[in-house]
Swiss-Prot record:
Keyword Phosphoprotein applies: yes
GO biological process: mRNA splicing, via spliceosome
Keyword Secreted: no
Pfam family, one: zf-CCHC
Residues that span the membrane, as ranges: none
Modified residues (Phosphoserine): 155, 210, 216
Zinc finger map (CCHC-type): 105-122
Region annotation (Disordered) ranges: 120-217
Record's protein name: Zinc finger CCHC-type and RNA-binding motif-containing protein 1
Gene3D superfamilies: 3.30.70.330, Zinc finger, CCHC-type
Sequence ranges of Acidic residues compositional bias: 145-163
Cellular location(s): Nucleus, Nucleoplasm
Recorded name of the encoding gene: ZCRB1
Length: 217
């Protein structure tokens, strides 16, 4: 996707440019006519020197048309510049594709280390302020409910201490002894009744067949 750009209508073809002008120089020159998206200078494959021809991609076609009317047949650094709307050769999508240069140790323009193309000494119009990097918006992730997982820790000991066996046996013996003492002090179910039990009226069934019951003293 081109993001709404129309290269066939918003790209200016400029020729007869001074060979010494760099990408950053052209960017500064043509930015007065509108938002410049990309500058491409045609260079020799072997020498990497400028051929004096460049393509200036603007954000909209109105800026491109204003540019051609303003600079066509005008002098720039002692040379008469030719400018027109570029003819689409079918490679528009490739032209507007952003290129990433991962080697930041060398200048794109001169190939020297220690600076980038924005501050290259070969820029005739001086240094250009690098564009601000777009901040990536972080998508808010909906936290998922965490499942509680019960972890069982494995013992690192291969065998148990023999002292633990004797200790557990002693505890079990002591517990059994306490339970035995408690049983001795508990009244048996067939033992003599207390005074409270004697005072309670006993229910005595009638000798004849009936659902009624008699209370005995």
């Amino acid at each position: 996707m081109s993001g709404g750009l129309a290269p066939s209508k918003s790209t200016v073809y400029v020729s007869n440019l001074p060979f010494s002008l760099t990408n950053n120089d052209l960017y500064r020159i043509f930015s007065k006519y509108g938002k410049v998206v990309k500058v491409t200078i045609m260079k020799d494959k072997d020498t990497r020197r400028s051929k004096g021809v460049a393509f200036i991609l603007f954000l909209d076609k109105d800026s491109a048309q204003n540019c051609t009317r303003a600079i066509n047949n005008k002098q720039l650094f002692g040379r008469v510049i030719k400018a027109s709307i570029a003819i689409d050769n079918g490679r528009a999508a490739e032209f507007i594709r952003r290129r990433n240069y991962f080697d930041k140790s060398k200048c794109y323009e001169c190939g020297e280390s220690g600076h980038l193309s924005y501050a290259c000494p070969k820029n005739m119009l001086g240094e250009r302020e690098p564009p601000k990097k777009k901040e990536k918006k972080k998508k808010k992730k909906i936290p998922e409910p965490e499942e509680e997982i019960e972890e069982v820790e494995e013992s690192e000991d291969e065998g148990e201490d023999p002292a633990l066996d004797s200790l557990s046996q002693a505890i079990a013996f002591q517990q059994a002894k306490i339970e035995e003492e408690q049983k001795k002090w508990k009244p048996s179910s067939g033992g003599p009744s207390t005074s409270d039990d004697s005072r309670r009226p006993r229910i005595k069934k009638s000798t004849y067949f009936s659902d009624e019951e008699e209370l005995s003293d």
